[in-house]
Amino acid sequence: MASSVRRRAFLHAAGGTALALGLSGTAAATPSFAASADEPAAGSEEFAALRAKWRDLVLGTGFSPTAEPFKTLLANLGTTAQKHLSTMAPASGSLWPDAVWADPDPNTDAASYAFSAKMNDSYSRLSVMAQAWAQPGTGLTGDAEVLDAVLTGLDHVNSEVFNTATQQYGNWWNFQIGAPQALMDTCVLVHDHLTAEQITKFCAAVDHFVPDSVFDNYSGTSTGANRVDLCRSVILRGIVGEDRAKVELAAGSLAPVFPYVTAGDGFYADGSFIQHRNVPYIGGYGAVLHDGVGRLLALLRGSAWELNDPNTQLFLDTVDKAIAPFIYNGLIMDNVSSRGISRFGTSEHTRAIGLLGTLVLIGQGAAPEENARWRAMVKGWMQRDYYAPPLKSPGLSLNRAAQLQDVLDDTTVKPAPEPVEHRLFHNMDRATHRRRDWAASVSMASRRIAHYEFGNGEHARGYHTGAGWLSWWGSGFGLEQYSDAFWPTVDPYRLPGITASRKPLADGQGGNWGQPCPDVDWVGGTTDGEFGATGQHLKGLESTMNAKKSWFWLDDSVVCLGAGITSTDGYAVETTVDNRALGAAGAPELTVDGRSQPGQQGWSRTFEDAEWAHVEGHAGYVFPCGARLSAVREERTGAWKDINTGGPADPITRRYLTLYTDHGTDPTDATYAYVLLPGASARTTAQRAGDRGWLRILANSGDQQGVHVAELGLTAVNFWAAGTVDKVTASAPASVLIREHRDGTATVVVSDPARRAVSLQVTWHKRVSQVLSRPAAVTAATTGASLKLTFGDLTGAFGAPQKIKVKLG
């Protein structure tokens, strides 16, 4: 506001009435929510203590406002709040001219979504102003004009739209989660300056939009992260209004979030997290759930409503099962963030910051060994993130900064290195492979998991992110790969690793919230925890294209096989070996079969029988069977608005170096085979290409795909159909991985990715003297000249690997 708008004067001028918005009436009088007379006097003190706790959780504690990064963050907060203060202009239908919530035709269409978002945004701006008023070092600390503006704004939004007489319109989330949370956060910060009448009105509005009935059933929009957010809305409303019943109801309603699920939204025993029925979302809603539960656990600890549910340990276990496998050197992998990757101003790195802070917070209530392990992980991730160090993020909040700085300053915490492991998430069609110097992950789709999600105008060109997208990062390079305007500029038909028809798809193909799923079942794989085999029966979105794709994850490489590639779309089908983002001016050397290729933009060439290729500073690529390899250097221009209606329209240009195989128009049973060597030098790549005995491709057809790597003692086969490959026979579709160890033992791991095997027999034609361990799923095992394993009904295993240990000889 250019000048202070006195709260009561404004309401008098406005007549204290609500804008019609196509709706009717003003907020009705509601009884006060203060503690009843028969409650103990200590009740108010307990609520005051909880408000103080929440205030600390919002603002952060334990930092010096004159030390960096806090000094700069506080100054930035003050600058933002001052901008809001200067531009605030209460009027009918808005609190700011650029945030009009008045909807002339309130319903649930896209326009109404936008109007309701402006109401939510108005509360968020008031929260920022309240934080600047409450925090030291902002230049607005304790400023009377700021406080008056916040109180005026709260009254205005309540009078106009967020009240008991307004009917919800647009996006339900804005009315039940976004606005209530921002409103209650603000009320906590300025609580001592609110009148009883204001508290009553604000709490009544929350009760109106978030009635007790939202907790009646764990379904619809009241599951997973949304349930946690709804609980937070009501718990804070109870604390602000000192209503014990509200706090008790909402705290108890967290219980369904903790147990693992076997279908629908929530965490699964394998570490998968699903929201919106079939979308992997650890980096989005999963992060929200973790943050919400973490804060509420901390808030209620030691109170009458402390969460003592034994299933909270299941939630804590998801740190290691679900969160950590997708964080690499300070980033959260894009393939578990869905629509979030299309949002301007965010990246794999910025999305990880909240999770890192959450791990620090929830660790305070975990077992000492868990807390120590998580703090070590967080410290290692922060120290290794050379591209976007969390404490230098311009959007970092004060509470997150305080949490992360505390870990960095703690000399008792030694940074944990990246683990060496392979993780299969068979309930969300993802796999991660982590080495000390690099990490990779594959993104797939099936009857259970959507190709992608489009909604709210977000993620308009994500249609091929489930087509075998293989993303990877190096420890000292490549952390910027998908974070430097990758999504608005990359060719969406040439994501790394995918096989796709060039048939043009419309933005948002599949429909708003359509979440299209292919009608295929065999998607998944198996792993011994260090190496892995993953497979995808791929059916293209709105396409006739079919393919069988496999990835075999080794110590320093990933073997990628494709077969049965068939299409009748009338368009070319391509497999993208890799598509390296080079920033605004990158031009790394490309070498193919020992010959350096031109570096100018616009260059392209097809190599008829390439054996290997190398991109300086990135990776090596080996083609064991030779490949008709196409390469292109190009500059691509796009805008965030192209993929997200909420993004800016400013054009951005980035360079790309793409390697791909063109299978031709309407191919029949086309194949490919290549090996990705992240971080390898040209010399190492050439040596690997020349070592004909290192890798044996045992099969690469539409029926089976398999490899053998003698030096690793590894044999892995994806059986799309029953058959025999080398020394392994499967009686039905299955994924099999065998590791022979130097101590004379071997590990055999088998899964049923299609979830259809009511019986399965796997035979390894290798002399075995004894079965050392086996799961209950193995109903019979015979040894001798061959190992024969008989499995019972595997449909209830949901594609989980079954591990057997045997003694050779």
Describe the role of every protein-language-model region.
Residues 25-48:
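C-terminal segment of N-terminal export signals and the immediately downstream linker at the start
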Residues 296-311, 315-759, 764, 768-770:
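Extended polysaccharide-engagement surfaces of secreted carbohydrate-active enzymes
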Residues 776-780:
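Small-residue (G/S/T/A) turn/hinge positions that recur once per unit in extracellular repeat modules
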Residues 43-80:
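N-terminal mature-domain "stem" immediately C-terminal to a signal peptide or N-terminal signal-anchor/transmembrane
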Residues 9-31:
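N-terminal export signals
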Residues 1-5, 21:
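Secretory targeting signals
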Residues 88-344, 348-349:
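Aromatic-lined, polymer-binding surfaces characteristic
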